[in-house]
Amino acid sequence: TLLTSLVSCTTYHPAGKKTVHAMRTGNESFLTKINFLSDLNWFLVHYSPDIIIVSDSSDRHGDHAALIELLQNTNAFHQIPICLTYIIHGGNDALWPSRNTQKFTRPPVCNSKMWGERISISLTKQEQEHKYNATLSFATQLKDDLENFLISFSKQEEIFFLLRDNINPQKIYSHVEYRENL
C-alpha cells in the first residue's frame, strides 16, 4: 500500500496495516526526521530484534546511506546484538551488480579488505526463484529498469557485511577506514 503523507511524500507499509507512527501514537503525522527517529526507536524497543540488516553507509544512494546513520541515532539500536549491512548502489548501477554472473562481484565502493570479509549466504534454486518473483512485484521500481538492475540481485547468494556483533564485540568493522582505502 502506498500512503500519501501530509507533506506530499509517500511511505510504504503493508496493505491494510497501519504505519509505525500510527501504531505508536494512534494517529498519522508529518514524516519528519524527529517523528521518524521516534517511530524507529519505538519499533526497535517494542519488537527487540536480535539482528538488524540495513543498507551500508557506503551505498551511493543518499537515502540508503543515511538510514544506518539515522539508526545509530536511536537509543535502542545499540541494544541489538548483531547488525549486518548490504549494498544496493555499489558505485556504478550500469555495471554493478554484474548482469551475467551467478555470484556477486566486488562493488566499486568496497575495497579488497571489506569484500574479503563479506558474509556470503548460498541460496537454493527455490529461494532464488522466490527472490526473482518478489523483485518482479515491485513494478514501480522496475518501470525504468532497462538495464535489469533490480533483477541482477537474483543470484545464487546473498552478501552482507558485519557492522557490529555485540556477542563477539571484537568484530567491529570500520567503514571509515574502508572508504579511506578505496
Map each language-model feature to its residues.
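Metal-dependent de-N-acetylase/amidase catalytic core
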Residues: 2-182
